[in-house]
Each structure stands twice: as C-alpha cells, then as structure tokens.
Amino acid sequence: MPNGKYAAHRLQQVRKDARWKDTGYSRRTLGLDIKSDPLSGAPQGRGIVLEKVGVEAKQPNSAIRKCVRIQLIKNGRQATAFCPGDGAINFIDEHDEVTVERIGGRMGGAMGDIPGVRFKVIAVNNVSLREMVIGRKEKPRR
C-alpha cells in the first residue's frame, strides 16, 4: 500500500477495487436484487392463482399455513403467496386474479415460521382480502 506525498491517486484506485469485495456494494451496484426479484423492484404485483398449497410451519410450530401458487402477469414468473386471515383461503379460487405484496421479512426474505414464502395476498379480483375475511365485502361474481 503506497503512502506518501503523491500516493492519493493510487490509494483511491485501491479503495475503488477493494469495494467490489463487499457483496452488499457489488449486488447493489449491479442491481442483482432487482433482477432476481419476481416483482422486479415494484411494491406490489398482480398474478393469476395456479393452485392452493399448504406450507408446513417450521419448528417448534406445527401448522399448515394456507398459501397460493401464483403466476405474475408482468413477467410470467411464479411465486408462493401467504393468505393472511382466518378462512381467507376460502375466498380464493384457481384462476382468480390476486394482488400481492412483500410479506415483510428481513432482507426481503420469508417471515416467521413460513419457509420460502416471501409474499402475501392483499386483494382478490380487486377486492381487499381483509374486508372479505371480516365480512364487510363480498367477492364479486364473475
């Protein structure tokens, strides 16, 4: 490592090269998280329900978390989304259009005891899932 009166340019260059060893910097600079994200960096996305799936909760909990497998409209990618609320899965059928958002886990990952599920359903056919669960709104008949 140079040190002296005329070493500034070389020191800057060394710093610049060393930054690429930091995974956070390199992923951020190359936009890798946005490229690998099914929603492509958007806060929400719409998708078509392919099937209903039950995801087993991680230890020490014992439950089957009700989720849906969806295909996003914007890019055709598939993802699994959690259906929050008591009996919420009953308001969702195959081929319905759902709106999903991130579930809120740390570093964009899964949350709590649901492994591999990074999204949650917030609306079915443009009607809020929460409103349907508490009985304030009905699912529109197509």
UniProtKB/Swiss-Prot annotation:
Molecular-function GO term, any one: rRNA binding
GO biological process, one term: translation
Family in the record: Belongs to the universal ribosomal protein uS12 family.
InterPro entries for the chain: NA-bd_OB-fold, Ribosomal_uS12, Ribosomal_uS12_arc, Ribosomal_uS12_euk/arc
Self-association state and partner proteins as the record states: Part of the 30S ribosomal subunit.
GO cellular component, one term: small ribosomal subunit
Protein name: Small ribosomal subunit protein uS12
Stated role: With S4 and S5 plays an important role in translational accuracy. Located at the interface of the 30S and 50S subunits.
Disulfides per UniProt: none
Record key words, sorted: Ribonucleoprotein, Ribosomal protein, RNA-binding, rRNA-binding
Keyword Repressor attached: no
Record-linked Pfam families: Ribosom_S12_S23
Organism domain of life: Archaea
